[in-house]
Amino acid sequence: MTTTEAPSALSFECETGNYHTFCPISCVAWLYQKIEDSFFLVIGTKTCGYFLQNAMGVMIFAEPRYAMAELEEGDISAQLNDFAELKRLCTQIKRDRNPSVIVWIGTCTTEIIKMDLEGLAPKLEAEIGIPIVVARANGLDYAFTQGEDTVLAAMPARCPEAATSEADQQERTNAIQRLLQFGKSPAAEQQPASSKHPPLILFGSVPDPVATQLTIELAKQGITVSGWLPAKRYTELPVIAEGSYAIGLNPFLSRTATTLMRRRKCKVIGAPFPIGPDGSRAWIEKICSVLEIEPQGLAEREAQVWDSIEDYRQLVEGKQVFFMGDNLWEISLARFLVRCGMRCPEIGIPYLDRRYLGAELAMLEATCQSMGVPLPRLVEKPDNYNQLQRIEALQPDLVITGMAHANPLEARGISTKWSVEFTFAQIHGFGNARAILELVTRPLRRNLALGTLGGSQWVSEAVTSR
């Protein structure tokens, strides 16, 4: 893996607290929409079903492409035949929806009762004739967004090692190019000719507009994206040959990166993630460096974006932001916000893979030094009680936290922002830097508006009276 060692100047701690995050089975919310010909079957209890129903807000009559296989007492006491029950459900799914793949999502309960999903899946797959992918997205071992990591880590084994024919290879290579040229006139500005370079796979689930933007940015450098993991359709999974290059888009995909390296012999590129203009430039430059391509116009592109968000930078400059830790985006967001002029005393994060995040950690340290602000304290698996004491002492201008702690902090007069909003928003690439700052500054702009109306005095009096 081409990466950067974690710098020693940063302070790393582990408080061994519990995961205070969304359940990782919530990855179904975006993955079932991303993989259009899939069906997700979550195998769990009523609690899992209630969570999915409430968290996703999709009514059952909308016929979403996911469902619950609800475990009962007979399953837990081994009185029922797991294979027969799952076969009945999957046969019904095949008859009603006919997906190209069924993804079984394991939960805490399947982990506790040691249900052998990996052993059952191949037998059932052979009987019903539909691929079955098993992902253990349980909340005992994984945090919020790591559910996506478990699903994507199971996908490389299903990717072809080589195109079935030369025509198929040409079809896969030109698919994205046809998408980019759709609706353009012949007189439209032409992109530089693609350089001859090894195959490049991008892994990480992002909305289609973001995927298009990143593909265009790479095409400007003469780089062709060979495929995406996950693909829009299971039948279009990318060819992953030995020696292919792969680079992640999200900081919580360390298991997927490891699988690509060990199982498919890919060369995983370690780079800062494309968050903010600084991260987007570093991400593209690292790809160009590995592929031995001279980057063109990135400094100008970055400067242009910084100019366009200057109004938001003035709002956050000098402010202090505290990350409690929820979705593993904390380090990338902190690095971008420090570059915007904020100070960050502490970054809490549920899980920290220093190898996969090595380049991001190095850039965080360099950014803090260039901006002349103290290095943040990084706390893995933070203890929320201790964190609340530190927040009380620091009194930061903004706390980015999970939903469970937002209202209690607001009641104490501390402005908060839900971290889950960054998970579902479009935040990658040059074009979405403004969207990040719009989310971050919303509580700050609200406070300014309340101050203008005299509302801040009412809030402070209410807090003091408590």
From Swiss-Prot:
Its cofactor is [4Fe-4S] cluster. GO terms for biological process: light-independent chlorophyll biosynthetic process; photosynthesis, dark reaction. Pathway: Porphyrin-containing compound metabolism; chlorophyll biosynthesis (light-independent). Gene3D superfamilies: Nitrogenase molybdenum iron protein domain. Binds 1 [4Fe-4S] cluster per heterodimer. The cluster is bound at the heterodimer interface by residues from both subunits. [4Fe-4S] cluster binds at residues 23, 48, 108. It catalyses: chlorophyllide a + oxidized 2[4Fe-4S]-[ferredoxin] + 2 ADP + 2 phosphate = protochlorophyllide a + reduced 2[4Fe-4S]-[ferredoxin] + 2 ATP + 2 H2O. Its EC number is 1.3.7.7. It holds the Pfam family Oxidored_nitro. GO terms for molecular function: 4 iron, 4 sulfur cluster binding; ATP binding; metal ion binding; oxidoreductase activity, acting on iron-sulfur proteins as donors; oxidoreductase activity, acting on the CH-CH group of donors, iron-sulfur protein as acceptor. Keywords: 4Fe-4S, ATP-binding, Chlorophyll biosynthesis, Iron, Iron-sulfur, Metal-binding, Nucleotide-binding, Oxidoreductase, Photosynthesis. It comes from the Bacteria. It is an enzyme of class 1 (oxidoreductase). Protochlorophyllide reductase is composed of three subunits; ChlL, ChlN and ChlB. Forms a heterotetramer of two ChlB and two ChlN subunits. Belongs to the BchN/ChlN family. Component of the dark-operative protochlorophyllide reductase (DPOR) that uses Mg-ATP and reduced ferredoxin to reduce ring D of protochlorophyllide (Pchlide) to form chlorophyllide a (Chlide). This reaction is light-independent. The NB-protein (ChlN-ChlB) is the catalytic component of the complex. This is Light-independent protochlorophyllide reductase subunit N.
